[in-house]
Amino acid sequence: HGNRKKIIKKIENAGIDIKCWGRGWPAGRINSDEMVRIFCQAKINLGLTNSSGTAFLKPFIRIFFQKNYDGKVRAQDPKRWLDNFKSFLSRKRKQLKGRNFEVPGCRGFLLTDSTDELKNYYEDGKEIIIFKDVKDLISKTKYYLEHEKEREQIAQAGYNRTIKEHTYEKRFEEIFKVIGLI
């Protein structure tokens, strides 16, 4: 996951105890029940959805090169470069992830990086906390570890917003309205 390990190392170097799960982490993968338990019990759930250091580089390289079926890299046909470049420019690197809804939906406190869309769903500072960079992430982590009552109020507000507006039932209702089924 790109530079996530570097970010985690900086957090550890700042004296913050942190544990990570998933592919490539010492704690390994966990099942969905365990994930929900962690979301509920963790003091801070960290969202690094946009931290991939290769989010720009790999797609850019693919404009000019591609892997063959045997894994060997070869140059793309120059006639395809313009279309590949247009595709590259049109893609969004920052995406709203399910995790942005799952954590608040479990009454978990979410400290996350931002996407253009995220502020349309949650109020920063009231329902979730958004960090700008690693320095801001570390500062906000230390702050909210020390301010339990405020952290719990934000987690509860995030939960209330999620249950009110961001359930699958609400999403399907919106979709059905758009396509004219209701």
Positions of PLM-derived features:
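Nucleotide-sugar donor-binding catalytic core of glycosyltransferases
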Residues: 1-124
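Short, flexible helix/strand-to-coil boundary loops that buttress conserved ligand/catalytic motifs
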Residues: 122, 141, 155
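C-terminal "capping" alpha-helix adjacent to the active site of nucleotide-linked donor transferases
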Residues: 134-150
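Hydrophobic "lid"/C-terminal helical patch
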Residues: 141, 175, 179
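A charged, aromatic-enriched C-terminal amphipathic alpha-helix characteristic of glycosyltransferases
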Residues: 146-176
